[in-house]
Amino acid sequence: MMIDRETQVVDCRCGAGLGKGGGLAQRGTLSEAGRAEVVAIAMSPGQRHITKPVCEITYGMRKENIQVSVLVLYSGSGIPESGMRTGSFVLSPVEVAQIEMHKLAVIHLGNIKDHVVRKTREILSQANIPAIVVSQIPVDFEDFAEAGIKTRLVMPRDEDIRTKGIVMDMVSGVTRGDSCPRDKLNLIIKYVKTTLDQLEDHKGVA
């Protein structure tokens, strides 16, 4: 893939796309970048989870010479039950390993705050990785910390921590099925670059 003067190699999926969601492949698939820097995590394409913004976010990061893989979760289209019990939304061991191959995760979620928080907790409870959460509905560090999720600015009490990974930043206002606004894309890229720099300097993550 040629982007301006830079070349990126992407190992694409063997599965065909669903014809919607901006061209992303079917659930349970990974397109892997040449270097394992960032993984964009998308929910399964379907009526509730149209993943169009993920393609634009991925392309925008690649234009900035950020190496991005894309993982479409197998069970990501499930509706969370009360307490996010096993069976409603889980990661497979393969998906956890695929996520942890990378330095940073960008998690694309939706417009129900409880679902955003619970799915973030489920992912980061299994995958030990810093993450940037992209959603339609606004969420903040306190929302995540109250659910036992480690964050860059607000931490739960030690006995309440329920995640291995940590939320570094979040960007709201990215609507499923719509184009990602330019200002939101710029903010995502800014947070990704800042976090990667912090990781390079061994700063900023617990």
From Swiss-Prot:
Coiled-coil annotated spans: none
Keyword Isomerase: no
Pfam families: MCR_C (PF04609)
Keyword vocabulary terms for this entry: Methanogenesis
Origin: domain of life: Archaea
Subunit record text: MCR is composed of three subunits: alpha, beta, and gamma. The function of proteins C and D is not known.
NCBIfam families: met_CoM_red_C
Name of the molecule in the record: Methyl-coenzyme M reductase operon protein C
